[in-house]
């Protein structure tokens, strides 16, 4: 009989692969920024939020906080590095106004240092440490997962799904579903809540995408007029456009 721990590890590995794909999804955007040396209208806010979220989950998964969570540490550690690369690109190609990103990064670093010191010095059991860090992970994870709601409102206003790529919604749904399953096999409420909400939010996106497809109206085709040609004999004395002809072709347009 297959043990629950083995199933959990397999699900976690699949979740790692899907999450890795999600972390890499903005690569083309950043490649365009590098080529054009311009950030244009792109904002660093989502990447700053994801960076903090990854830092919290890495800390949560450490053996000194929540043992047996190596898969949580690995994928969020990878995500931490990827987000740091994205933010470095933002910093290099940003204007002076966007240099405030450095202040936000410093604030996040100080916040994490305060959390780490407070938890390690103030909480002396795994249960208490997991509780404190887990609550923070739920709060910031929920904020990150709820960000697509603003995109959904934009889709409703514009009646266009170009701002909400279907593939990204599907992969996000599978990612949330995978990590929710992982958390339920050996119940972990702190992983279950944000990922369960992620499943709910991305399912709403998929339903909205489907409804938008149904609401698309097919363009109406205007009825095409039909022409009937009638050949009429002309006498030799008749002059048409300065020349004579034996027959005149008259086009009669008929409405369908």
Curated annotation (Swiss-Prot):
Mediates both low-affinity uptake and efflux of sugar across the plasma membrane. This is Putative bidirectional sugar transporter SWEET7e. It is a multi-pass membrane protein. Keywords: Cell membrane, Membrane, Repeat, Sugar transport, Transmembrane, Transmembrane helix, Transport. Residues 1-9, 67-69, 122-130, 186 are extracellular. Gene3D superfamilies: 1.20.1280.290. Pfam families: MtN3_slv. Signal peptide: none annotated. Residues 10-97, 133-212 form the MtN3/slv domain.
